[in-house]
A protein has these predicted regions:
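Active-site machinery of serine-nucleophile hydrolases
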Residues: 64-68, 82-85, 130-178, 303, ...
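Short substrate-entry loop that stabilizes the transition state in hydrolases
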Residues: 103-116, 121-159, 257, 280-282
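Domain-level recognition of soluble alpha/beta enzyme cores
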Residues: 27-119, 330-334, 345, 350
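Primarily recognizes the serine-hydrolase "nucleophile elbow" in alpha/beta-hydrolase
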Residues: 199-264
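Alpha/beta-hydrolase active-site loop
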Residues: 159-217
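Bacterial N-terminal signal peptides
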Residues: 10-19
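The feature captures the conserved acid-bearing segment of alpha/beta-hydrolase catalytic domains
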Residues: 246-308
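C-terminal catalytic-base region of ester-bond hydrolases, centering on the histidine
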Residues: 31, 291-370
Length: 370
């Protein structure tokens, strides 16, 4: 681990053969079980709407949490409108979501052995929080309450309970040069995404104090944040700026908003985990990603991964790609990367929010002095 700013991370290439999740169905079966969570808790899930009157902004927030055993309905992977939008974007089979089986129960009672640490989950641009279900269910089964905010207009679509929807809209000037676009993206991250994170944290405090369902279950002295792509940038910014967040993880996002090294890096002075693809790690800005970072920073390069490997995309696409047969080899690769991602993120937050051991994380990450 890094304890002084004079230390630097040595990225290492990781190819780990892990036991495949037991409930991953064979590709020729009709239904497809997402990988089973590996923790001791059953998982529940609820989706709520948080309204910020000051900013005239509504946010859909999905929460996965440790639950008691329940016979309540198994949660759908996503609603039909969201699935239709994703199927169009990713060229998936119509109604694929009906065949994807999750492991969370809708509105299951919360486990009584709380309160539980909180992990905020931040999505990338033009996707939806549901594509991080495997990661979210895994964290929840290991004793974390996961809070995933849908951030319009950065998400692919937000479908609210009353039926109205908001779709992805670019928030950067399309015809501008790369640096100008990067400045616009950084401004959006600061003024919208990090503001959303802070608003959600404020609402969690209210919920823990007064809400009938959540009262006493949220340990808000132990908060982490993990994000992918643009969500990784959000996670880095929020970890830097928000004192309530103790640790963060960035899944192949940039610490340079808009991937522009001349805009500004984001130094992080708290425990932080980077998971990166080989392509990202070999980029010209990679060596400066963590300039100024200190206090237990990890940088892991995942061999063979692509940008979407840190989501459910590889699992879903290998099974439900339109006009092609299921790809068993692609499914196996996706399972390996998904399992590795979940394991390292779970261990990282267990270490820094629960003071637990992190044997796999500490085994594969090494540092040296400059």
């Amino acid at each position: 681990m890094i304890t002084k700013a004079s230390f630097r991370i040595l990225p290492i290439f990781v190819l780990v053969l892990l036991t495949l999740p037991s409930r991953a169905s064979a590709a020729n079966q009709a239904e497809f079980d997402l990988p089973r969570p590996n923790g001791c808790h059953p998982v529940g899930t609820r989706t709520i709407v948080l309204r910020d009157p000051r900013r005239s902004r509504d946010l859909l927030v999905t929460m996965w949490y440790p639950a008691t055993e329940s016979a309540s309905t198994l949660a759908p992977y996503m609603d039909k409108k969201t699935a239709d939008a994703l199927a169009e974007e990713w060229k998936l089979q119509p109604n694929f979501q009906r065949l994807v089986l999750t492991h969370a129960r809708l509105q299951a009672p919360l486990a009584e052995r709380g309160p539980f640490p909180v992990v905020l989950l931040e999505h990338g641009s033009s996707v939806v929080p549901a594509i991080y279900t495997v990661l979210a269910e895994g964290l929840a089964s290991n004793g974390f309450i996961v809070v995933a905010t849908n951030h319009p207009p950065d998400s692919l679509i937000s479908v609210f309970p009353d039926g109205h929807e908001l779709k992805f809209t670019p928030y950067w000037p399309a015809e501008a040069d790369r640096r100008t676009q990067g400045v616009a993206i950084g401004k959006f991250a600061d003024e919208v995404l990090v503001a959303d994170v802070r608003f959600v944290l404020d609402q969690l405090q209210e919920m823990d104090s007064h809400d009938r369902v959540w009262h006493g279950h949220l340990d808000l002295s132990k908060i982490g944040i993990v994000g992918h792509s643009m969500g990784g940038t959000t996670a880095a910014l929020a970890t830097q700026k928000e004192p309530r967040i103790l640790a963060g993880a960035n899944l192949d996002g940039s610490t340079y908003p808009g991937m522009n090294a001349d805009v500004r890096p984001i130094p992080v002075h708290k425990p932080f985990l980077f998971l990166a693809t080989e392509e990202h790690a070999s980029g010209e800005t990679r060596a400066r990603e963590y300039i100024g970072s200190e206090s237990n920073t990890y940088y892991v390069v995942v061999s063979g991964a692509d940008h979407m490997s840190f989501t459910d995309a590889g699992l879903v696409s290998s099974r439900f790609t339109r006009d092609s047969k299921p790809d068993n080899s692609a499914l196996e690769r996706a399972l390996l990367t998904s399992t590795l991602t979940r394991s390292l993120v779970e261990e990282f937050f267990a270490k820094y929010l629960k003071a637990a051991a992190a044997p796999n994380l500490d085994l594969i990450v090494r540092v040296d002095k400059k």
